[in-house]
Structures are given as C-alpha cells and as structure tokens.
C-alpha cells in the first residue's frame, strides 16, 4: 500500500495507515444492494415508457433497488424540478417545465399495470403556479380512482404555502391518507 504524503502541518489530523486496516467492514444491513430482478426491471421499464417521475429516482434514494425489486414506488407528480431548495432533499431545484396534463393518466395506468393495491403519490413544490399544483393533485387522484377503484391512496403533499383553498381542494378529493413531511426544525434550517 502506498504511503500518504503530507506536509508536516496536516500529519496530526490525517489518520495513520494502520488505522485504515483496523476499520471494521460495514454491517450487511447498511449495504445497499444493486437493483436486480424481474419486478425491478418491469418497474424501470414503466417509469421510462411513460416518462414518470418517482421520488426514488429524483431524490437519489439509496433504497430504490430494494423497493422497486418488491414492486413498490412512490410516484412524484408536477415534474421533477422543485421551486424550493430544502437542505435535506435531493430533488433538483430550479425553474420547472410546464405541466404535463397527461401525467395523471400515465400514473393511473402504471398503477393498474403494476396491480398496486396501495399507491403513494408525492410531488415537488410548485410555488410558480397560481394553485401551487393543487388541481394536478386532484386530477391525479381522480384518474387513479377511475382506473383503479380498489386501490387505496396515500398522498404526501407539499404545504401549498398554507393557502387553505388549495389544501381543501386536495382534502375534498378524499384520498385515504393525507400526510406532509416536516423534515427538520427551524433552528437547524439554513437561512
């Protein structure tokens, strides 16, 4: 093994070579498995065919192979570019493209093909839209209901900037579960 060459001032902060050899291997439960299997391949094909977004791909989730291998995914609507820049999130930030109004049907069709009994839908924040994307949320829920009447729906929604009429619009669509992540406390959020 080649020695690490350092200047004198850095020697105290760099670990000695012998320490590298004494580091324990990662436990098996911490290792991410490579995505494989028929279900993974089928799901990858659907996502590519219908140009769908999932939080799995957009958020660079390390568990994607495991979830997709079991035939589960969290669909992400309203595009794959968020108008916010949360420090805890891996989704791209910027100026989103215009809405794809065929997205609700594509998501519903994929859920039908996958025979999903419980679908999870999330979205990017769309502060650039007058309705914050609430109409697209309703359109997606209704499309899923039409094509998959027995599928239960879990919605992981943005805050819609706290505008009640947008939140009410989604609540009135009656998904079985409405949830909202609060990822961190204010004192830990970058200003």
What is each stretch, according to the model?
Residues 70-188:
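Conserved Radical SAM active-site core
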Residues 1-84:
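Flexible, acidic/Gly-rich N-terminal and inter-domain linker regions that tether
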